[in-house]
Swiss-Prot record:
Protein name per UniProt: Phosphoribosyl-ATP pyrophosphatase
Pathway(s) annotated for this protein in UniProt: Amino-acid biosynthesis; L-histidine biosynthesis; L-histidine from 5-phospho-alpha-D-ribose 1-diphosphate: step 2/9
Gene name linked to the record: hisE
GO molecular-function term, one example from the UniProt record: ATP binding
Superkingdom, natural source: Bacteria
Entries under PANTHER family matching the protein: HISTIDINE BIOSYNTHESIS BIFUNCTIONAL PROTEIN (PTHR42945), HISTIDINE BIOSYNTHESIS BIFUNCTIONAL PROTEIN HISIE (PTHR42945:SF9)
Species assigned in the record: Bacillus cereus (strain ATCC 10987 / NRS 248)
Keywords assigned by UniProt, alphabetized: Amino-acid biosynthesis, ATP-binding, Cytoplasm, Histidine biosynthesis, Hydrolase, Nucleotide-binding
Main location: cytoplasm
Keyword Amino-acid biosynthesis appears in the UniProt entry: yes
Length: 107
C-alpha cells in the first residue's frame, strides 16, 4: 500500500503529464516556477503565523499546503520523490555538529 505522500506526488506528476483544465495543480504548472515558488513562500508564512498563534489545527493544514507546493516544485524540476527519500535516509542517524551551525537569534 502506498503512503499518502507517494499518492499525492503521483497525482501531481499525472497532472503534469495529462493536465486537467480546472486543476489547481495544472494552473501552477502553467504559471511556472516563479508562481510555484511564490506559493511556497506564502504557505511558509502561513505556517509561521499558525504556529505563533498556537493554532495546531491550522498549523497542520498549512504544513500540508507547504508540502503540496514543494511536491509541485519537485515535479516541475523533474526531481523524484525517491531522490528526496534517499536524502532523508542518508541524513537519518548522522551526527550533526551543533557547534558548526550558526546560532539562531530570537525573533
Amino acid at each position: 500500500m502506498k503512503n499518502a505522500f507517494t499518492l499525492l506526488f503521483e497525482t501531481i506528476e499525472e497532472r503534469k503529464r495529462n493536465p486537467l483544465p480546472e486543476s489547481y495543480t495544472n494552473y501552477l504548472f502553467s504559471k511556472g516556477e516563479d508562481k510555484i515558488l511564490k506559493k511556497i513562500g506564502e504557505e511558509c508564512t502561513e505556517v509561521i503565523i499558525a504556529s505563533k498563534n498556537n493554532d495546531n489545527e491550522e498549523l497542520v493544514k498549512e504544513i500540508v499546503d507547504v508540502l503540496y507546493h514543494c511536491f509541485v516544485l519537485l515535479a516541475e524540476k523533474n526531481i523524484s520523490l525517491e531522490d528526496i527519500m534517499e536524502e532523508v535516509t542518508e541524513r537519518n542517524g548522522k551526527l550533526s555538529r551543533v557547534g558548526d551551525r550558526r546560532e539562531i537569534d530570537t525573533l
